[in-house]
A protein has these predicted regions:
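Structured loops at beta-to-helix junctions and adjacent beta-edge loops in soluble globular domains
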Residues: 11-13, 48-55, 133-135, 142-144
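Generic alpha-helical propensity signal that fires on short helical segments
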Residues: 28, 65, 148-150
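Domain-level detector of nuclease and nuclease-like folds
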Residues: 26-27, 32, 68, 139
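Short, Lys/Arg-enriched charge-dense amphipathic segments
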Residues: 41-53, 61-65, 84-93, 195-197
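Short flanking/linker segments adjacent to small metal-binding domains or redox-active Cys/His motifs
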Residues: 16-19, 47-82
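Short microdomains enriched in Cys/His and/or Lys/Arg
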Residues: 29-45
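C-terminal, charged low-complexity interaction regions
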Residues: 70-223
Length: 223
């Protein structure tokens, strides 16, 4: 179960995440208003911790599976770069790392109408995506898209503002984010500099613009 998942970490990291959990728990008790008031960097760190943990276990599972078959486990250069940047950004929890300009993520928080016994959770660790919904609120996070998917879905996000989502609407919205990520032909790039006060991460917006492939309604309907 998820409760059994544990990751190796230093005492400094453990303490930092415990302090983060206290902040999120306090916001959680206030429902949508509390979660929506949280700084998005805190939500990035909180969701990122879970996605990173799942990614860690997925990599261990795949490594062990291949070793049993006498094969080597290797990540592609693109995945090594993606996960390396993600790990660097997560260290903003304990290190002086700041994000300037456009944020590396898209995070949408909204009121959600679920019955008290329903809990919705989805993740795509490889693509660094996450969704979470309970009675009162839900949120969807794309943790390394440079805000591109949020811009793609801006029209529908604007229409949602001020409305409480039905569970089916929540599932459809996550499907929209997930499919947008699938057809996105874009590799996020960053300017990362070490300065006197710490590390600065800036999303590069010049150069090749994001391009989305053909939106196939039949495939979208299956998500």
């Amino acid at each position: 179960t998820y409760a059994d998942l544990k990751l190796p970490c230093s005492s400094v990291v453990k303490k930092a995440f415990e302090e983060l959990d206290v902040k999120v728990q306090a916001a959680y008790k206030e429902g949508y208003e509390g979660m929506a008031s949280l700084d998005q960097e805190l939500l990035f760190q909180w969701t990122g911790r879970m996605v990173y943990g799942l990614l860690y276990y997925e990599m261990l599972y795949e490594r062990d599976r291949l070793l049993r078959q006498g094969e080597d486990f290797e990540l592609s250069a693109d995945l090594r770069e993606r996960f390396g940047r993600f790990h660097l950004m997560l260290q903003s929890l304990i290190e002086p790392i700041s994000f300037i300009g456009k944020k590396p993520w898209t995070i949408a928080v909204f009121p959600l109408k679920y019955s008290a016994d329903i809990f919705s959770y989805r993740d795509d660790a490889i693509n660094l995506m996450f969704s979470f919904g309970v009675n009162g609120f839900g949120f969807i996070a794309c943790l390394q898209d440079n805000g591109v998917i949020g811009e793609k879905q801006k029209e529908i996000l604007d229409k949602m503002e001020g409305h409480v989502l039905h569970p089916i609407q929540f599932e459809e919205l996550y499907a929209r984010f997930h499919y947008s990520d699938y057809i996105l032909q874009y590799k996020p790039k960053y300017k990362i500099e070490t300065q006197d006060h710490g590390i600065v991460v800036e999303a590069e917006t010049a150069g090749k613009q994001p391009l989305f492939g053909f939106w196939d309604e039949d495939i979208f309907a299956q998500l």
